């Protein structure tokens, strides 16, 4: 097995995790069983891949963009019948295993520059979630992104991303990851997060979700303003006040103070009001 003199490439956002304790925490959070098929994004030199293959997981399928690393990974793990490797961009290549089966869990050290698009590919959008959802995703992301994903209403980091992710999955922190845990050290702190996607039947109806998306774009465009001044709807103010009260929302609130489920109730109330008005 040889990776030659390969050094991390900035254009690929490569920062290789080398801290043994963090690698163990990722594996523990994945909670792999013998019926799990794991999709690993960005295996690098295979530090985590080695642990995944040492677990009881039925299969480990890695996706690596850097051609220079692919040969080394194949040399190192290619003899294992439980290991498969695809060279390519994780945003573009098929994510199924070679036998056509789908992974049950995802473990990823996400390059910071593709966090948003990759989250959308792995979990989906509010109005178009991944179906069926993965059972669990354990992701290493920039700390700022992790804080936004798991933020609670009222926190300064609570954002439209917080609402979207929390309506799609249960989000929790696994552990902080300081720069010294990587080679080379990034300029920012990182965090391992765990996402357990909600079953489709526990997610809001896609029609409601489309309305939620419109509301979030309106409100968070001016996040410091009260909702009274940012929401653009067809209903008169008196009717809007009734709808927001029923959703548990005060129009004097700012968007970062409104819980995810309240956005859903607001969207549902507005859609019902629109339907009632159109039937007159």
Curated annotation (Swiss-Prot):
Q: What is its subcellular localisation?
A: Cytoplasm
Question: Which Gene3D superfamilies does the protein's record reference?
Answer: Ribosomal RNA adenine dimethylase-like, domain 2, Vaccinia Virus protein VP39
* Entry EC no(s): 2.1.1.182
**Catalysed reactions, as listed in the record:** adenosine(1518)/adenosine(1519) in 16S rRNA + 4 S-adenosyl-L-methionine = N(6)-dimethyladenosine(1518)/N(6)-dimethyladenosine(1519) in 16S rRNA + 4 S-adenosyl-L-homocysteine + 4 H(+)
What cellular component GO annotations does this protein have? Answer: cytosol
* Keywords noted in UniProt: Cytoplasm, Methyltransferase, RNA-binding, rRNA processing, S-adenosyl-L-methionine, Transferase
Which is an annotated GO molecular function term of this record? RNA binding
**A Pfam entry, by short name:** RrnaAD
| Residues the record lists as binding S-adenosyl-L-methionine | 15, 17, 42, 64, 89, 109
- Name the major location: cytoplasm
Q: Which PROSITE patterns match?
A: RRNA_A_DIMETH, SAM_RNA_A_N6_MT
InterPro entries, sorted: KsgA/Erm, rRNA_Ade_diMease-like_C, rRNA_Ade_Mease_Trfase_CS, rRNA_Ade_methylase_Trfase_N, rRNA_adenine_dimethylase, SAM-dependent_MTases_sf
The family classification in the record reads: Belongs to the class I-like SAM-binding methyltransferase superfamily. rRNA adenine N(6)-methyltransferase family. RsmA subfamily.
What the protein does comes down to:
Specifically dimethylates two adjacent adenosines (A1518 and A1519) in the loop of a conserved hairpin near the 3'-end of 16S rRNA in the 30S particle. May play a critical role in biogenesis of 30S subunits.
Q: Which HAMAP family match?
A: 16SrRNA_methyltr_A (MF_00607)
Q: What is this protein called?
A: Ribosomal RNA small subunit methyltransferase A
Q: Which organism is it from?
A: Synechococcus sp. (strain WH7803)
Which gene name belongs to this protein? rsmA
């Amino acid at each position: 097995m040889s990776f030659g003199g390969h050094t991390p490439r900035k254009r690929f956002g490569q920062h290789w995790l080398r801290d043994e304790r963090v690698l163990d925490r990722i594996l523990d959070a994945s909670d792999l069983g013998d019926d799990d098929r794991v999709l690993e994004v960005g295996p690098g030199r295979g530090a985590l891949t080695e642990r995944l293959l040492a677990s009881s997981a039925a299969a480990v399928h890695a996706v690596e963009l850097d051609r220079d690393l692919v040969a080394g990974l194949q040399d190192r793990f290619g003899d294992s019948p439980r290991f498969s490797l695809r060279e390519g961009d994780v945003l573009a290549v098929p994510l199924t295993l070679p036998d056509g089966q789908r992974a049950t869990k995802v473990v990823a050290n996400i390059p910071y520059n593709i966090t948003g698009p990759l989250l959308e590919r792995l979990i989906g959008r509010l109005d178009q979630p991944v179906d069926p959802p993965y059972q669990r995703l354990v992701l290493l992301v920039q700390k700022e992104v992790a804080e936004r994903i798991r933020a609670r209403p009222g926190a300064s980091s609570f954002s439209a991303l917080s609402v979207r992710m929390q309506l799609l999955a249960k989000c929790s922190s696994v552990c902080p990851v300081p720069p010294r845990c990587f080679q080379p050290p990034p300029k920012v702190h990182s965090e391992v997060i765990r996402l357990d996607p909600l079953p489709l039947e526990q997610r809001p109806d896609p029609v409601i979700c489309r309305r939620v998306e419109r509301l979030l774009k309106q409100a968070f465009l001016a996040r410091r303003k009260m909702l009274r001044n940012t929401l653009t709807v067809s209903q008169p103010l008196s009717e809007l006040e009734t709808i927001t009260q029923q959703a548990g929302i005060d129009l004097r609130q700012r968007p970062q103070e409104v819980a995810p489920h309240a956005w859903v109730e607001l969207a549902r109330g507005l859609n019902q009001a629109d339907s009632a008005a159109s039937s007159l």
